[in-house]
Amino acid sequence: MKALYRYPQMEFPYEILLQDNKARSCQEPEFKLIDTGVLDDGKYWNIYVEYAKSRQNPKQLWCRYTIHNANQDESATLKLLPQFWFRKCINDKQDNENASQKPQSPHIMQINEDTAQVIYDLGNFSVSFDINNQRPTLLFTDNKDDPGGESGGFGCKDAFHRYLIWNDRAVVKSNKCGTKCGALFELRLSPGGSIEVYWVLSPEFSQMNLDLQAAKKIFDERLEEANDFYDKLFPISWANEQRNIARQAYAGLLWSKQFYSYDVKTWTKKKALRERKKSSVASVISGQRSALKSEEAGCIQQSTHVDSVVSSVNPAHIPLEEEMLVDKDEKNKEAGCSQQSTHVDSVVSSVNPAHTSLEEKILVEKDERNKDWKHIQNHDIILMPDKWEFPWYAIWDLAFHMIPLCRVDPDLAKQQLLLMLSDTYMHPSGQFPGCEFNFADPNPPLIPWACLDVYRKTGSSDTNFLKSCFHRLNFNFSWWINKKEDGSSGLFTGGFMGLDNISVLDRSATLPGYTLLQADASGWMAHFSLCMLEMCVILAQHDNVYDDLALFFINHFIRIAEAVNMCIEDGGLWHEVDHFYYDVLKSETSKRPICIRSLVGLIPVLAFSRIKGTDLVNVPSLRDKLQALKETYPSYVLFSDEGDVILTQVPADRQKHIVSCLKNADEFFSPFGIRSLSKFYYHNRYEFQLDKKRTLSLCYAPGESNTNMFGGNSNWRGPVWLCMNYLLMENLQARGQDFTILGSNMGDDTLSELAENIARNIISIFLPDENGRRPLHGSVSLYDLPDWKDLVLFYEYFHADTGRGCGASHQTGWTSLVIEFLFKCANKV
């Protein structure tokens, strides 16, 4: 594992970044570190971080930092502080005076100048440091919150920051023992100079002198093996540029692994305690103010004892890490005009948070996040969307992660999918968790597609894996049918569905008196049905019980396809004039289409499947059913000349209109992929009159969001998103065997060629253009320099008209799908 951390030698411009971005409007791009100038003129550090293991001792972990002074004119000093810590190891009873026994925390303890022992109930370790025989200064503290906030606190988790930045030597632990350890190196490098720093974590106590030559050999061997592995994986036809992009994409994907810990029941319990304390403090201070008002006039001096007030509320029953409960703004609000008096402290300290009023309990219950997800007990290593900016899992992001991952680590890909299907993640009702901000917000049901794809990409032999997935996915399918279908109409009301601001409406919100029938939710469910059907066909080769189950899913597919394809005035989602699928806002008296050409209306196209005729031999009930459906529903069930069955939600005549729109450069087709919203809305703002008082609107925004909807951090109103482009490319490729584009004015002859063009356009975002610049970097001239030109960032989404990267910049994550586009263009899919 290897990563580059590029850090300025000047003061990090926190305040400049904060103030400049606060001053910018929604019409302006984000002001980034690279825009501040602190990285100009080579005034930065290149810090390469590498991890490797020895074959002789695979439980021993080596790390090497290679630090380069990029400044060719001046020497510079860097303070390097590798850190090791245990997660908060504080038991809820640890600070209770009445607890009969205090649990012993694990700890790290210095044993000589460059080695520390690690004492832990899962095993004992040692960590040793070396830098050409230079000894570090070992620092120790505890990984616990500072109860004093900015006032300072001995032995707390921010002690190293205070030690380095504020030169406060008293905050670290002099006994050289704690739950957090740092090894401080002060490095002085000449212009253009470099140095290597090593440390090793060993699974036993050791006072070893590091053999740096042996360590270098370990890194050289692992690098050679990694190069051999990727050389065999990548097509011979790839040039160095393609290999460079793919290697960095895989590096980002593998670095996105993170230990994620969230126990909703425990979190909710602690939150309730916090709310009670806040409520108790507020009630007492409010009552005290009322009493003081009768004795004093005007504004009375602010109390300096609010911090102690908060921490004195029955502390015996509050975990240590929960002690500081009121932030500065809340303190100021509550203490704004109160008397400086020790009487306030004594009054508040007598409040018992257990005696909470009914109103307060109702308030806590009302504000309780994820209150219906108390079964969630997540303590696992999971691939994150972006470890820097989105350090929490999102269920449909993770489905995309598995596609490139299964090429390099198939076992991990299967494990991640089974994890999401387990009972500590999936709700007892069958719903998948969305993301931690609201587990109940539905994401597109793409886990079944990912399970099927991983099964096929890993050899199509692990039927036990597929069977395990199928039975758990059955619960999720039933949840969608029972909870999100509009009656028995075959249309669905998914809500959020991961596309943030793509509509004029906030699709996460509830509109009283209305139901939003969604083209994407309905399309996803048809797609879900076909994925389950394909699994049944595979599993029926070994167990005929799946033959009957297949009938269940084909019936649902036909029902949904028929409903979606009805004209809007007849209760469906197809607009006969615009030739597009739209969401429909339904009330008791009306059905009003939201006529926006976006990815929402393209998703029904994804519901497509081709089942080989030879596979139907062992599924006789399904084979007979399909023969009958061919006569009744010829638009959705077709047979090829080879005897294969083709299932499609979008009939051929409507597919022609959709593809025409998809291929049009003034609509969806951009030089860098398929847009999320038609460019038609650049000059034609769309307006939707919700009622007499509210008119909603949107327009084409090819880069960053031009509204604050969903926080303004993402944008589905024009930019190119690799996740949806991948699904469209894959679908067009599959359809290309049986359908051709009619009409020479549409350019390409087949859907397969259109898929290839999409892949090439996506790849062009990352490749240097005729001027040697990668479109994803925009106009940043630093990337013209030798030290920068080979670096690739994997942004969340991309400006549809320029290819410039937008949003989170380490989204590998689903932007690692560029690997699949590269394979597509190499004809190795």
Ranges and model annotations:
Residues S294-N370:
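Feature detects tandemly repeated or modular, low-complexity segments in exposed regions of proteins
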